[in-house]
Structure formats: C-alpha cells, structure tokens
Amino acid sequence: MAVQQKRRGLSFIDAKASNVKKIAVMASTVAFEFNKATLRLRRSLHISPRSSPEVQRKATAGENSEVGSPESSLSTSRCSKRDRKLCAELSSFALYPIFGALSPSHFSSPNLLFQSEKNSSRRSFEFMQLPDTDICQIMSFLDAQSLLNLSQTCSHLRQLCLAHEDNAGKRDVTSHEITISFNQIHRRTEVRLLKRERTRTDRQFISNNIRGVLAPFSRALTKITFETTVFVTDWLDEILQLHRENRLIPLSLLFTGGALTKGHQVTGADLRSITETEFVDFVTKLQPHLQEVQLSTSRIFKISTDPSQLLGMISMLSSFGIVYERPPLHFYHEEISNAIALWKSDPLSRCCDVYMRRPHDVSSESWIKLAGSIDESRIDPYTDEVLVSQITIKHSFLVHIDLVFHFH
C-alpha cells in the first residue's frame, strides 16, 4: 500500500513537472516570437535598437537627444501602426498552439500577419479594374466632396456619378462660371464651364446643354454669360428646370455683345423673341439668389408695359444695367420716381447700382426732391447744362441701404 501511494505521489509530481515544463516552453516560445517580431518590425521601419553601435556612436557624438525625442522622424501615427502590427503578430502565434489544430484554415502558421500581407499584395489590382457595381457600392460610402472629386478624374467615373447623383447630397460650387457662345467655325451654340480665375492651361468643360457641364453631386452657384448671336429664349426653360432641381443657382445674368454694334447693325445676345413681362417673370423665379442682371446687348425686347416693369427689378437685385440698346431707351421722371418709391417702401430691398442712360426730363432739383444726393456731375460743353452722372438715394427705414444711379 505504501509503495502504491509513493508511486501515486511520484506520478503527481511528474505530472506537475510536466505542466510546468509545458508552461516554460510556451513562455520561451512567446519570448522568442516577441523578439523576432520586434526585430522584424524594426528592420521594416529602419529603427535601430538603443544598444546598437549606430545609436552608441550618435550618443558619444552628442546626438543622443535625437533618439527617442518627440521631434524625431518617427511620428505618433507610425508608432501606433507599429504597435498594432506587433499586437497582431503576437496574437497570431499566441493563439496558434491552442486553435491551430482545430481550425487550420484560419491559423495555418504563427506568422499570420506577414503571410496575409504577402497574399494580399499578390491579389492587388487597380481601382478602374473593378466592376461598375463594386465602384457604385464604394461610392455609396463617400460624402459629397469625395464624390465630386471622384467625378472629375475621368469620363468613365463621371458617367457613373451622373447615373447615381440623385441618391446623394449636393455640394455648393462657386469656383466656375458658365458661358454660352456661338461657335463661328462649327456653326453651333456651345456651353462652356470655365474657372473664374483661369489661365490658358485650365481645363474647360464643353457641351451642347447646360446640364452636361455641371459636375455631379454639386449645386452650381454661378454667373451665366450669353454672348453675341445667342438666342436667349432657347435656354430659359433649361435654366428654370435646373433651378427647380436645385442643380443650378444663377447669381448673375450677363447679356453681352452690344459694344460691337456699328451704326444700324445691331449685335449682342438676342432677346427680341421675349417680351418685357416674360423677362421680368423669369428674373422673379430665380429669386432670392439672383443678384445681378446686365442687359449689355443691342438686341433687346421691346418695352411694352406702361409704366415699365423693367425698373421695378431694382428692388430684388444688387446690380442692374441696361446699355447699348437700339433704339436708345430713355426713362422718364415719372417712371424713375415710381421705381424709387417702390424700392424705398420695400423691406426686402438691397443696395443696388443701376447703370442706364441719362433721362431727358430730370433736372438736378428733381433729384434733390427725391431725397437724393448728387455725387458726380459735369457741364455740357454745348448747352452749358449741368448733367448729373451719379446720384445716391437713401432707403426710408433701412440703414446703410443705398440706391445708386450711374448715368451715361
């Protein structure tokens, strides 16, 4: 009996010693793998250990302050990345003795991290090689600015963005302007999207309609310029449609080309197919964003309303001009007085600069009666009459809101 108990005690001691030996072997393995992973990471990141001859040489030369200092080339992000790699490396070989036999497909070797990196590098391919469905799924995780940048890389991605732009938000873009001109060589009207502060090397977007030049996932807050010989009525419906879709917000409308008029040969953007009432209604629908309208064209619509509705737009604009029209348009004192009275009584009026021809029947005393101050005037060399060039009128109850007339 005593012999059996002694054997049992010896077997227990042997079992205990065996467990201790296993733990010691596992601890040695962990320490070995830890040192191996540390050396590998130091080698990949080009970090020398403190005990290396290079570090000791720098320390003796007075450069020891650079080692481990916050101003070293190794940033915090790289340190955290190194720590994550080290933890992944340690977790891979620490879990391998336990789960390696149970799940060899997931724990095929202790060096899982670097093996997966090698496999992924062999499977890498370019972004444009992805199917369109995968690219669209990636686009669903991007914000409006990232989608806008993606659409400006190439035509293929631009078309994909255009096909899925209804499912994302819009970003305001103010860096470009739209120009509609007639190409004399190809005999067609073209729409161009140009940078506001551009050079000759900047890229241009050209299309036969306004929608084709607008960037996907954007809302264009822009100036629209109609150049000479362009029929404006062909573009009004598209502008209103894009405005309703919240894709286009015109801030300024410029109708140019009137300066090229010589004698009876009128030039400029063609507004003769639209009436005065239709034009005022078009400007009203673009409020409250539209700030400027410049009618610098000779091909203007006829003033058909009495009194004219054209001057009434000064209450909703910040700048309004009507020059180069043929035949010359001169407003009368009564029409100007009514427009000023409407502007002074409107609580939504803005500061506005009006550029127009000098009226014939308005004297300096008449401007003063309208509560205006004459800023600039000159003497007519032929009649010795005082000609008012600029006048400023204050608002009735809004402070720092002025109406300035510039006459020519």
From Swiss-Prot:
- Keywords, in A-Z order: Ubl conjugation pathway
F-box domain ranges (all copies): 124-170
The name this protein goes by in its record: Uncharacterized F-box protein C27F2.7
Q: Which SMART domains match?
A: FBOX
Metal-binding recorded as keyword: no
Q: Which InterPro entries match?
A: F-box-like_dom_sf, F-box_dom
Q: Which cysteine pairs make disulfide bonds? A: none
Give the organism, scientific name: Caenorhabditis elegans
Biased composition annotated in UniProt, kind: Polar residues: 62-77
Sequence segments annotated as region (Disordered): 49-77
